[in-house]
Amino acid sequence: IVEPSIINYIVSIIAKTRNWHTIEVGASPRAGVNILLAARAMAACHGRDFVVPDDVKTLTPWVLRHRIRLRPDAEIEGLLVDDVIRETLDSVEAPRR
């Protein structure tokens, strides 16, 4: 079971990557679908039939790492994709249970 608030959370994360100041090419809607599928799998592995925000937070870097491209100036500054993904995640408020 996936609550609408979790789906909205994933959509917000994807939207942030498309408007983030250090990201040149953000994640596509398909990346959001893959985050959702991965989060459902993680929930099942933990014996749950529901997804929690921490599932999304844990798996988002794994799903997005190869799907976004940093701006050249961000790369020159030494920023890493994982750092930018973490900043993006931190900027989106997770739903409360």
Describe the predicted segments one by one.
Residues 1-14:
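Histone-fold modules and their flanking histone-like tails across chromatin and transcription assemblies
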Residues 8, 17-97:
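C-terminal engagement/docking regions of AAA+ P-loop ATPases
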